[in-house]
């Protein structure tokens, strides 16, 4: 079974979107506790904090996205952004690398860790 690799930017955006939905769900659950104001307020505050956390994550990924290197994917020929030494295409999940020493090797996200970079040299 082959693992499906996805783009790092898309992973973080998906996490931020899930934080929005989780926050709204927590606030919605808080409505069911109208008779218990303390529980309702705690649920509303936790939900609000989850939505605020998603805003922070979206801001962070926006900053990262501006630093990512735009490349043209050789498979789908669409522009995508590469974060780190290895990443996947945003459109077709094709493994991509910016490091010539990794060309032709099996795709592994561990190549982005500093320990892996030291062991390669």
From Swiss-Prot:
InterPro entries from the UniProt entry: UPF0295 (IPR020912)
GO cellular component: plasma membrane
Keyword Transmembrane: yes
Membrane topology label: Multi-pass membrane protein
Compartment(s): Cell membrane
Residue ranges crossing the lipid bilayer per the database entry: 14-34, 41-61
Main subcellular location of this protein, as a coarse class: membrane
Entry keywords, A to Z: Cell membrane, Membrane, Transmembrane, Transmembrane helix
Tagged with keyword Transmembrane helix: yes
Lineage top rank: taxon: Bacteria
Signal peptide: none
Protein family (similarity comment): Belongs to the UPF0295 family.
Name the record gives this protein: UPF0295 protein ABC1323
Organism of provenance: Shouchella clausii (strain KSM-K16) (Alkalihalobacillus clausii)
